[in-house]
């Protein structure tokens, strides 16, 4: 019985660690896209990224949720171009998770 309890606890710790690593990887990938691939930082201010763009909205102030970021990145808005076709759906999701997680924090 003790061995089964140990196995169960170990399994949950392993899953928690794996999920945390995956979340950190997604944030790192999203930040890289924000800074280097889509170069969102040239227009947007986001403290976590160290960006101070003055053209687009200050993302720390508006604190957009993931869906809002995804729709805006996919379709563009105002002078911001659409990135659907430029970024993969996985990249759009990663940058959306990154921005919605760190904005205003």
Question: What do these predicted ranges mean?
Answer:
Residues 56, 84-85:
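Short, solvent-exposed loop/turn segments at secondary-structure boundaries
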Residues 16-35, 68:
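Electrostatic cytochrome c docking/interface patches
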Residues 86-105:
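C-terminal capping alpha-helices of c-type cytochrome domains
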Residues 31-32, 41-77:
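Gly/Gly-Pro-rich "capping" loops immediately C-terminal to redox-active cysteine motifs
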Residues 1-24, 105:
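N-terminal export/targeting leaders of redox proteins
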């Amino acid at each position: 019985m003790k061995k089964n309890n140990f196995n169960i606890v170990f399994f949950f710790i392993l899953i928690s660690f794996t999920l945390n690593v995956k979340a950190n990887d997604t944030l790192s990938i999203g930040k890289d896209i924000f800074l280097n691939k889509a170069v969102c930082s040239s227009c947007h201010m986001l403290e976590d990224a160290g960006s101070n763009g003055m053209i687009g909205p200050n993302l720390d102030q508006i604190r957009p949720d993931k869906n809002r970021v995804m729709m805006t990145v996919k379709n563009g808005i105002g002078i911001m171009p659409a990135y659907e076709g430029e970024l993969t759906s996985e990249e759009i999701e990663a940058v959306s998770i990154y921005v919605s997680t760190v904005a205003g924090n």
